[in-house]
Regions:
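Active-site-adjacent segment of SDR/Rossmann-fold oxidoreductases
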Residues: 189-197, 222-223
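N-terminal Rossmann/SDR dinucleotide-binding element
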Residues: 2-113
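Glycine-rich "substrate-gating" loop/helix at the edge of Rossmann-like oxidoreductase active sites
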Residues: 205-210, 232-235
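Hydrophobic/aromatic anchor residues within beta-strands of the central parallel beta-sheet
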Residues: 94, 138, 161, 199-202
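SDR active-site strand-loop-helix element
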Residues: 39-40, 65, 117-121, 161-166, ...
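A short helix->loop->beta-strand "cap" motif at the edges of active sites that frequently abuts
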Residues: 59-60, 156-160, 196-197
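Conserved Rossmann-fold NAD(P)-dependent oxidoreductase catalytic core, especially the SDR/UDP-sugar
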Residues: 2, 119-185, 189-190
Length: 235
């Protein structure tokens, strides 16, 4: 019998296998149960996980908002599968749209009685955003887009608005970080003036297994037979 091994013989690792700590206990039920939730960037790495986790707590409606048709299609299918598996009554509403379109946002917030907003829509890939021909669009999306959805949320007296930010907003050294920091500053200013909406932010570091992060890149490179590449010789 040959002792040669194939790639298909290697057991797949879950993310839990790679993490040295236990999962953090969730405390989101009061913000999700029997509420209408709006998730911008719902098809992205972070937005889709927010959607999957919040859905388990039985909101009345969960509005999945994304500019990407294929990402929206995928997260809607995943949420429908969770709904069926757990026998939930939540209405799942996938909506194609752009946070830069303030008029459309106003229409949606008027149509749906939204209680909580989770704003995860952003351009986040540093090298792409840093390219001279992408800077303007990145700033429009990350700054103006955040400005639009936050103002609309305040105008419609949404209970809470959570902006998903990044650790790169701390003393930013690139366009992505600077654009997110400017968005943060606007959210902070709204929190001191908006009477009914509670605005807050959470800064993420590098999110394991997110799109464009090292794990999916490495897995793809290994599956193709290598080589596995890094961004700097000193890494």
């Amino acid at each position: 019998i040959s002792d040669q091994k194939k790639m298909t013989d290697i057991q797949n690792l879950s993310l839990d296998d790679l993490l040295p700590r236990a999962r953090v206990a969730e405390d989101v039920i009061k913000n999700a149960s029997n509420k209408t939730l709006f998730i911008s960037g719902a098809g992205g790495s972070i937005g889709s996980e927010i959607a999957r986790q919040l859905l388990k707590h039985s909101p009345i409606q969960i509005i999945l908002f994304d500019v990407s048709e294929i990402n929206l299609f995928n997260i809607e299918r995943q949420c429908q599968a969770i709904k069926e598996a757990q026998n939930l009554s939540t209405e799942i509403i996938p909506i194609l749209g752009d946070i830069r379109d303030k008029k459309n946002l106003g229409y949606l917030f008027k149509k749906f009685q939204i209680n909580h907003v989770y704003h995860a829509a952003a351009y986040k890939h540093v090298p792409l955003v840093e390219a001279p021909h992408n800077i303007t669009k990145a700033c429009e999306n990350n700054i103006i887009g955040t400005h639009n959805i936050a103002l609309i949320a305040a105008e419609h007296n949404v209970e809470s608005f959570v902006m998903i930010s990044t650790d790169k907003a701390v003393r930013p050294s690139n366009i992505m970080g600077a654009s997110k920091r400017m968005a943060e500053m606007f959210i902070q200013s709204l929190n001191s003036t908006a009477s009914k909406t509670k605005f807050s932010m959470v800064r993420f570091g590098n999110v394991i297994n997110s799109s464009g992060s090292v794990i999916p890149v490495f897995l793809d490179q290994i599956a193709r037979g290598g080589p596995v590449t890094v961004t700097d010789k000193d890494v």
